[in-house]
């Protein structure tokens, strides 16, 4: 029997014999992925995760995985004629994502819960569910590319820099990457995605993109934290770098590194910025803009995606990104172990905050080499 040519998902069999679970949030991106694969003849199974209490989020626009989104995902499945399931992951999501989100702010960090959700829920539990459903792979609507390299599948930035989500997916492991597919990563723009949705007659073709953190109604994260951790907003002192008290703050959770507005300490001359948070002393430390300049960034919990082990070299020349909204910059990784390193930024950056991710890219290439979490001690 002749070998079957590879289908569009990389399997040597017909699409009809290839089962793919599509993680459906109810938004246009994952809906287009499911519709395109169904139209190609794949054995598509749509799965949507119910992640949190939908009471407040039911009518909230701009969230993902809310009650309305589950309804939209179901309508897309009905339109395209494939099965769709909703799984209750509220307890898992709270334990794996929301609790850490609250605790991180209490510790003076600025967390990125979307990364933890991908790492601990979508690409862990949901991926295992896909395998339990005898799927050959799982597809998502993320804007990122999976390319085959000499050592196996590699993670690459999306073709559209404006939509690239590589910063939020650095913790994808090689084992997960082998099972995952990202059909939208090659598209040149979001307009192409919406055009595909319209072509398939999907009810979500004009649905707005998701905004903010899905479990934070109206973007008021401090309110969510106070409900989860009573006493989180205890007031304290605002002090300068010498320890001089300049005023009182409303609780450390209301502030982040680099913040200038809303400090309530105007009239002191040059603008002052939050340069450090000390939750133990309940202090917000402020200073001039130059005090924000950071060159050395301690990084831990590193997920390394390079072909050679991280510790096989004393230094790695990379491009590094310390915030999702910033461009990557030249940097040097100096490994301390398989999962910890000191990262030197060739040009200092302002506002490097504990709790954010530091993501590594190959110089002159679109490949993601991994990343880790910024820890205290950046200087």
UniProtKB/Swiss-Prot annotation:
CDD domains: MnmA_TRMU-like. Disulfide bonds join 117-214. Its main location: cytoplasm. SUPFAM superfamilies: Adenine nucleotide alpha hydrolases-like. It is found in: Cytoplasm. It catalyses: S-sulfanyl-L-cysteinyl-[protein] + uridine(34) in tRNA + AH2 + ATP = 2-thiouridine(34) in tRNA + L-cysteinyl-[protein] + A + AMP + diphosphate + H(+). It is an enzyme of class 2 (transferase). ATP binds at residues 23-30, 49, 141. GO terms for biological process: tRNA wobble position uridine thiolation. GO terms for cellular component: cytoplasm. Gene3D superfamilies: Adenine nucleotide alpha hydrolases-like domains, HUPs, Translation factors. HAMAP family: tRNA_thiouridyl_MnmA (MF_00144). Catalyzes the 2-thiolation of uridine at the wobble position (U34) of tRNA, leading to the formation of s(2)U34. Belongs to the MnmA/TRMU family. This is tRNA-specific 2-thiouridylase MnmA.
